[in-house]
């Protein structure tokens, strides 16, 4: 996300429009999940913000983080113009936030022991996922949930306290 905002800052600087974008790395200004409110009140101007981070205010935002939502770039372009994202963007705009760019990351599952292709493959596995709805989906499939910040995933996989992400 840092690199994405850096590209925006570099392009704005090249455009010479009198706007200076300063990036605050490593959660030094706001923690990632605390950025929604400052964006809605004008205290934070730009953020590369996963919408699911604001799901405690707008639960429907969690749907944007579900696996398989977007399959590739072409699908992302179509999806962004579809009814779900139209409604999501209305909520964003009504909160006073403007989307500068849409970004979708292809995601999936990683495992040290088996291939996770279907919900039934999660049964009995200890997994870590991002977002409340994602965790609920995995629990419904029979997985055990290991909560940990993304910064601790690598260590969790090394120590086997986490087998799947």
What do these predicted regions represent?
Residues 1-7, 26-31:
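Extracytoplasmic "Venus flytrap"
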Residues 26, 150-151:
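An acidic- and aromatic-residue-enriched active-site/binding cleft used to recognize and process polar
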Residues 9-18, 40, 45-46, 50-145, ...:
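Contiguous mixed-secondary-structure segments that line small-molecule binding/active-site clefts
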Residues 21-25:
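A short beta-strand-loop structural module common to alpha/beta enzyme folds
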Residues 159:
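Flexible glycine/serine/alanine-rich "lid" or loop that lines and gates the nucleotide-sugar donor pocket
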């Amino acid at each position: 996300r840092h690199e994405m905002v850096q590209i925006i800052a570099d392009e704005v600087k090249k455009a010479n429009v009198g706007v200076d974008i300063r990036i605050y790395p490593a959660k030094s200004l706001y923690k990632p999940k605390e950025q929604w409110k400052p964006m809605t009140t004008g205290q934070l101007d730009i953020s590369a913000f996963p919408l699911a981070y604001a799901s405690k205010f707008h639960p429907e935002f969690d749907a944007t983080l579900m696996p398989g939502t977007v399959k590739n770039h072409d699908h992302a372009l179509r999806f962004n113009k579809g009814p779900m994202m139209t409604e999501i963007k209305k909520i964003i705009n009504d909160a006073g936030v403007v989307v500068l760019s849409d970004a979708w990351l292809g995601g999936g599952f990683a495992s040290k022991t088996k291939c996770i292709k279907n919900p039934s493959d999660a049964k009995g596995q200890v997994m870590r996922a991002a977002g409340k709805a994602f965790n609920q989906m995995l629990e419904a499939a029979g997985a055990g949930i290991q909560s940990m910040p993304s910064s601790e995933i690598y260590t969790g996989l090394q120590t086997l306290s986490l087998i799947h992400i």
